Amino acid sequence: MAGAQLRTSVYIDAFNLYFGSLKGTPHRWLDLEALCRTYLPKNSVTAIKYFTAKVSARPNDPQQPARQQAYLRAIETLPTVSIIYGHYLSHVVTARLATPVQGQSPYVQIIKTEEKGADVNLATHLLNDAHVNL
């Protein structure tokens, strides 16, 4: 079996990839297949599963959904990539101000948006794929 490449599936949490590696850089359009070839040169990557959620427009960035959709359409053209969607959940929470103004409440209400489903989807796909020997 010398020289045989290991058959490999890659599972990517898009939220963690973005905030851990891409946010604050000029890089946005990451070629997932090239990334896998770079980090796994001795493996045969047969599947890349990309776990994400569709973003909503924000007052400070109304074009964010269009940019995300363009990227998702692009990576869908890669033969090994499949996209699995979770969702975002927004709700009002109370948060403490970092520098409260004296004489005013140190608390404000904010809208907190959290990604839901990607972690569970990723774990479920990973276990199922291992079970069926993907």
Question: Where would I find each of the regions flagged by the language model?
Answer:
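Domain-level signal for Mg2+-assisted phosphodiester chemistry and nucleotide/NA-binding surfaces
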Residues: 1-114, 118-120
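Short, surface-exposed connector motifs at secondary-structure boundaries
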Residues: 129-134
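Acidic, metal-associated active-site segment
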Residues: 121-128
